[in-house]
């Protein structure tokens, strides 16, 4: 079954488990957990992905990481984001 999966990511992601925050351009935001990350995107978990804006900034304070991004898919509490 796995041989039929087509990988669409531009870069391999690395498994992590880090606390983060999605900072919205209107000043709001939500906490998240970063599950994997690459130079081009990440998979994050949020309490409720409904209502996420079209773009936001992913912050990982422990790594001094800040990157504009946008969601490309979501399933339950999982969200895939692409970096801008």
How would you name each of these model-derived features?
Residues 31-34, 67-72:
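Short beta-strand-centered aromatic/proline hotspots
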Residues 25, 39-40, 74-78:
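Short, conserved beta-turn/loop elements at beta-strand boundaries and strand-helix junctions
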Residues 1-35:
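N-terminal helix initiation/capping motif
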Residues 42-46, 77-84:
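Short, solvent-exposed secondary-structure boundary/capping segments
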Residues 18-23, 53-62:
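Short conserved beta-strand and strand-loop elements enriched in small hydrophobics
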Residues 50-52, 74:
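Short, surface-exposed beta-strand-loop junctions and turns on beta-sheet-rich folds
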Residues 6-10, 40-46:
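Short alpha-helix capping/helix-loop boundary micro-motifs
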Residues 26-30, 63-65, 77:
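Short acidic/polar mixed-charge low-complexity motifs
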């Amino acid at each position: 079954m796995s041989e039929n999966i087509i990988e669409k990511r531009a870069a391999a992601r690395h498994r992590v488990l880090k606390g983060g925050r999605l900072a919205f351009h209107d000043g709001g935001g939500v906490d998240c957990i970063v599950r994997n990350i690459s130079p081009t995107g990440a998979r994050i978990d949020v309490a409720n992905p409904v209502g996420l804006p079209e773009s936001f900034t992913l912050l990982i304070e422990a790594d001094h990481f800040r990157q504009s991004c946008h969601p490309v898919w979501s399933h339950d509490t999982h969200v895939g984001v692409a970096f801008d």
